[in-house]
Design a protein with these regions (language model features):
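Charge-biased, low-complexity intrinsically disordered regions
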Residues: 1-220
Length: 220
């Protein structure tokens, strides 16, 4: 299992910061009709059951927003990826169809309300840590320009930063040539319910990505 630690500096501000990690060998391909139906069906459930005004008060999103405020980041400008994804759906914009791994990642995030990110292990270089973004820290987000990552919880390796609960970098993004992934679920409120979604993640990775050699770890 890839070794990931949470830095003490971040723990002081967010003592309950937790990462739920899944490492697996997978087959990256276009999402099957059955996976895409599962995603679309859940999007319809969200549209029926939720109003956009309620988003910021959902416990897992609210907890993340409060930590961002403590870190000095405006949570409405630097939204959690789970909040941004659900907002798109409630605005009628739908979900981007990328590949089965990214789409599974998004489904887990939609259902759990936790931000989640998936990374190509081949492009990661130990040691890996979750830390607070330093002054002038930035990277090119997936489908975005350079993003100011200062004072945001940030996954970094020996080369630099590559992921966060807000937006991931292009360096470790999942493309068709990825064969082994690290999927991270970000919780600002401890391990409660992370077990449930790690189990769910394992199941749908096996079902829709032929995942093998699956390892699961909770990091606090």
């Amino acid at each position: 299992m890839v070794d990931v630690i949470i830095c003490e500096e971040l723990k002081k501000i967010c003592p309950e910061m937790t990462l739920g990690c899944i490492q697996a060998h997978v087959e990256v391909e276009s999402s099957s009709d059955s996976l895409w139906k599962e995603i679309n069906d859940y999007c319809e459930v969200l549209k029926k059951e939720m109003h956009i005004e309620e988003l910021a008060s959902l416990p897992r999103i609210k907890e993340g927003r409060e930590i961002y405020k403590k870190l000095g980041k405006a949570p409405s400008k630097y939204r959690l990826s789970s909040e941004a994804l659900i907002r798109r759906i409630l605005q009628g914009k739908g979900v981007y169809k990328i590949n089965n791994i990214v789409d599974i990642n998004n489904l887990i995030s939609l259902k759990s309300k936790f931000p989640a990110g998936s990374y190509n292990i081949e492009n990661l270089h130990n040691p890996i840590s979750l830390m607070i973004g330093k002054e002038d820290e930035q990277y090119k987000g997936i489908g975005k320009e350079q993003i100011n990552m200062e004072n945001i919880p940030l996954l970094t390796d020996s080369i630099g930063s590559f992921g966060s609960p807000t937006s991931d970098s292009e360096r470790a993004m999942i493309t068709s040539n990825a064969s082994e992934i690290l999927m991270c679920i970000y919780s600002f409120s401890g391990k409660t319910d992370i077990d449930e979604y790690l189990k769910y993640g394992k199941e749908i990775l096996e079902k829709y990505a032929n995942a093998k050699d699956i390892k699961i770890k909770i990091i606090k």
